[in-house]
């Protein structure tokens, strides 16, 4: 057996000790402003023009003390498992929303309230979230929910944006690795569309591991956005990568990079073409309503078969051939096109959405007749976003660039007209993946800002050891030229982000006492005869002890309680402060118990008092000048 390392075809190893900047040979500049001058035909900076450009770039992103950003940005946390909230254009981090991870600051994954939301999946303490998206009405953000996928454990979560907390998590049955996630845009977000990436046998019980078996497949998944329950699943040929939906409510589409159903790198690149699969949502709904569906593996979810049979299309899907291994799938903000990004091809494929009716009615001999352009943009196109002025912006992973191109001119060039549809190429640092322009996935794309999420930062920041931050770059696209104005280090590993106007997100200042987030805890207290806003009592129920207390900075309602060694202890605290931003905390030392209690919130946590002796609890939040004195004692008597 050879001891030679496996090599990716075409890959080149960087010499050890050589910086990324030198190896890539991008000629990247040290200042963000200079990078903004890489437009085609841009001139050389003079000392004066350098100073002017630097001043302009700084003013673009400066948000002064006490001033507010124009946009909310929602970033996926990747394999860290959370969602991050940033202000744009300042790129200041405002909040982290734990979802699939355990968070000791807020107690997410530790409190009883969060465990109820996590459900059976609470056993997983990891997640891999990629694609955050906000619910819509009539193609515009309504600010109600944000949805996020978990590729690691095949889940989809919903975040209530009024409280910036996750309120529902669904494990998608019959599939593995929920990756691409998008929402129905029109008439409203009725469905969350979620792609399962990996092909698996059905049933997946070890009876076979043959991916070529007819019962080995993956599925396109639709989730009822309000109920957070499965609506339907569609069996497909090949696998599924990224997806998007149209502006009519009729169609969704997904890329496929493994039409071969292979399990190795070489096999996945064997076919010269893969495809975009388009789903006819109305036909799927009609079939399910008529009872024309099956169920799988003991699940009750309606399943329809969207695979071809003997070369004949299913009524639910159409497969449009595109160059091999496409990645991103993006709907233009004018609602005209699905853009499939080539990845291994230097092209993107523009699919005319207004031709899809004819495609489903079998009026084309070749499904590629719905493709109206296939512009060549550069090496490694991954994702495309839009400015609402007819221009598209595509990340080029291999070239470490973003390319601005005009969609109408690309169509004219495809028809044979000599026109230069590429408007500018801008170096970014380095290897960009997702990108997102302000409001671009809605009908209100305003063409002001572009965020490019670069997978490598290398020499852009102070060194942090072998693990480097990512680099989220902010680009001004309000004028004719793209201008890089900010580098933002990010912990591993954001994949995508979205930008919404600040007026589209309405948040609560303090909790409503009737909030469903802790309604179950309120109901349990009621059974114990407890008024959570006034009572400070201990309820003993066999081996279980329920401790109820209020908190008002800087004191807990109970400063001492006694239990027996081995008791299961549930501490329930209600913050009766009514002042905005006066959050309290509760930590029981040496018991792994920690949680947040914000104004008017009730939180509870359960642990075992397994160590006899005195154990202090304290407020972990700096809620008052005397917060150090906000303490109490648990006295654990020997069993």
Curated annotation (Swiss-Prot):
Gene3D superfamilies for the chain: Cupredoxins - blue copper proteins, YVTN repeat-like/Quinoprotein amine dehydrogenase
Binding-site positions, Ca(2+) 2: 257, 260, 268, 274, 325
Positions that bind Cu cation A2: 619, 621, 623, 627
Pathway the protein contributes to: Nitrogen metabolism; nitrate reduction (denitrification); dinitrogen from nitrate: step 4/4
Assigned keywords, A-Z: Calcium, Copper, Metal-binding, Oxidoreductase, Periplasm, Signal
One term under GO cellular component: membrane
Pfam family, one: nos_propeller
Post-translational modification note: Predicted to be exported by the Tat system. The position of the signal peptide cleavage has not been experimentally proven.
Catalytic reactions on record: N2 + 2 Fe(III)-[cytochrome c] + H2O = nitrous oxide + 2 Fe(II)-[cytochrome c] + 2 H(+)
Broad enzyme group: oxidoreductase
Cofactor(s), by name: Ca(2+); Cu cation
Sample GO molecular function, one term: calcium ion binding
Residues reported to bind Cu cation Z3: 131, 434
Sequence segments annotated as region (COX2-like): 543-639
Disulfide-bond pairs as recorded: none
Co-factor note (free text): Binds 2 calcium ions per subunit. Binds 6 Cu cations per subunit. Each subunit contains 2 copper centers; Cu(A) (binuclear) and Cu(Z) (tetranuclear). Cu(Z) is thought to be the site of nitrous oxide reduction.
Residues annotated as binding Cu cation Z2: 130, 179
InterPro entries reported for this sequence: CcO_II-like_C (IPR002429), Copper_CuA (IPR001505), Cupredoxin (IPR008972), N2O_reductase_N (IPR011045), N2OR_C (IPR034205), NO_Rdtase (IPR023644), Nos_propeller (IPR041114), NOS_propeller_2 (IPR041142)
Subcellular location: Periplasm
Residues annotated as binding Cu cation Z4: 495
Family: Belongs to the NosZ family.
Quaternary context: Homodimer.
Function as written in the Swiss-Prot or TrEMBL entry: Nitrous-oxide reductase is part of a bacterial respiratory system which is activated under anaerobic conditions in the presence of nitrate or nitrous oxide.
Name this protein carries in UniProt: Nitrous-oxide reductase
Originating organism: Pseudomonas fluorescens
């Amino acid at each position: 057996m050879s001891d030679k390392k496996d090599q990716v075809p075409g890959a080149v190893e960087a010499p050890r000790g050589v910086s990324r900047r030198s190896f890539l040979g991008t000629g990247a500049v040290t200042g963000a402003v200079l990078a903004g001058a890489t437009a085609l035909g841009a001139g050389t900076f003079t000392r004066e023009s350098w100073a002017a450009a630097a001043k302009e770039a700084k003013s673009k992103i400066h948000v002064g003390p006490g001033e507010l950003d124009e946009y909310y940005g929602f970033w996926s946390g990747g394999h860290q498992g959370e969602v991050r909230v940033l202000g744009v254009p300042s790129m200041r981090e405002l909040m982290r929303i734990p979802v699939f991870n355990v968070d000791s600051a807020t107690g997410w994954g530790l409190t009883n309230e969060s465990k109820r939301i996590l459900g059976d999946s609470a056993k997983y303490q990891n997640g891999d979230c990629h694609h955050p998206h906000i619910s819509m009405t009539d193609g515009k953000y309504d600010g109600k929910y944000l949805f996020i996928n978990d590729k690691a454990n095949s889940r989809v979560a919903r975040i209530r944006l009024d409280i910036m907390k996750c309120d529902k998590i669904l494990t998608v049955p019959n599939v593995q690795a929920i990756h691409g996630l998008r929402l129905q845009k029109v008439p409203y977000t009725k469905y969350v569309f979620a792609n399962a990436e990996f092909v698996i046998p059905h049933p997946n019980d070890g009876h076979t591991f043959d991916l070529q078996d007819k019962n080995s497949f993956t599925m396109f998944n639709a989730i009822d956005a309000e109920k957070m329950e499965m609506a339907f699943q569609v069996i497909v040929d090949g696998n599924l990568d990224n997806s998007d939906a149209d502006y009519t409510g009729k169609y969704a589409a997904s890329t496929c990079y493994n039409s071969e159903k292979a399990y190795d790198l070489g096999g996945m690149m064997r076919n010269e073409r893969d495809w975009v699969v388009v789903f006819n949502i109305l036909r799927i709904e009609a079939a399910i309503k008529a009872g024309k569906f099956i169920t799988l593996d003991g699940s009750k979810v309606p399943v329809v078969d969207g695979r071809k049979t003997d070369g004949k299309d299913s009524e639910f899907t159409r497969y449009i051939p595109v160059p091999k291994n496409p990645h991103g799938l993006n709907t233009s903000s004018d609602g005209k096109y699905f853009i499939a990004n080539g990845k291994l091809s230097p092209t993107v494929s523009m699919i005319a959405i207004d031709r899809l009716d004819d495609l489903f009615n079998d009026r084309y001999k070749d499904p590629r007749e719905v493709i109206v352009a296939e512009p060549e943009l550069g090496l490694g196109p991954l994702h495309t976003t839009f400015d609402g002025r007819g221009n598209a912006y595509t990340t080029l992973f291999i070239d470490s660039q973003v390319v601005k191109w005009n969609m109408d001119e690309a169509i004219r060039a495809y028809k044979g007209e000599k026109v230069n549809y590429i408007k500018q190429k801008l170096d970014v640092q380095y290897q960009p993946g997702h990108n997102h322009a302000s409001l671009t996935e809605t009908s209100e794309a305003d063409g002001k800002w572009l965020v490019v999420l670069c997978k490598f930062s290398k020499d852009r920041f102070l060194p942090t050891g072998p693990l480097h931050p990512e680099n989220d770059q902010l680009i001004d696209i309000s004028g004719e030229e793209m201008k890089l104005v900010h580098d933002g280090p990010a912990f591993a590993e954001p994949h995508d982000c979205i930008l919404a106007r600040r007026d589209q997100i309405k948040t609560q200042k303090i909790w409503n006492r009737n909030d469903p987030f802790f309604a179950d805890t309120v109901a349990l207290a009621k059974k114990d005869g407890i008024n959570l806003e006034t009572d400070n009592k201990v309820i003993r129920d066999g081996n279980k002890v329920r401790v109820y207390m209020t908190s008002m900075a800087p004191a807990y309602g109970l400063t001492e309680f006694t239990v027996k060694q081995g008791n299961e202890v549930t501490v329930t605290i209600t913050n009766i402060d009514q002042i905005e931003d006066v959050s309290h905390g509760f930590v029981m030392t040496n018991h792994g118990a920690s949680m947040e209690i914000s104004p008017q919130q009730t939180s509870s946590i359960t642990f075992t008092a397994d160590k006899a002796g005195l154990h202090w609890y304290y407020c972990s939040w700096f809620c008052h000048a005397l917060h150090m004195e906000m303490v109490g004692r648990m006295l654990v008597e020997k069993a």
